[in-house]
Amino acid sequence: MKNIQSLIFTLSTVCSLVALSPSVMADAAAGRAVYDGSGACGACHGALGKGDGPAAAALDPKPRSFSDGVFKYDTDGDGIAGTDTDLFNVIKYGSAAYGGAATMPGRADIPDSDLQSIVAYIRTLKN
């Protein structure tokens, strides 16, 4: 029993360190800069990702709130919706490419590395 407790403690510590690693936090910080800047994500999704940006009132359907951490698209057919790959694909190609609304445009003009950083930032917005 003591070995199992030690294993669980070790695994949870490692997971915590990975989740808070400087590279992940740097990616999220870079993602926020793009989200707020050239990505213009906040115009629809809001500064805190709650779907309440200044342009949101004019959109139907309303922009997704990132605070609940629930995403509906399985863009790569792996049977799991809302993975980092799924978020990346929806941001890059737009939700209409996956049967969603055209109100979420694709942003293929943004470099892939910046799109990955935006995904990292969006993950930090979950309550």
Please state what every model-predicted region is.
Residues 44-51, 92-96, 106-109, 123-124:
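Detector for the c-type heme attachment site
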Residues 28, 34-38, 98-101, 125-127:
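Short sequence/structural segments immediately N-terminal
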Residues 74-115:
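Axial heme c-ligation environment in periplasmic c-type cytochrome domains
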Residues 1-12:
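Bacterial N-terminal signal peptides that target proteins for export
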Residues 56-70, 74-76, 88-93:
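Solvent-exposed helix-loop boundary motif
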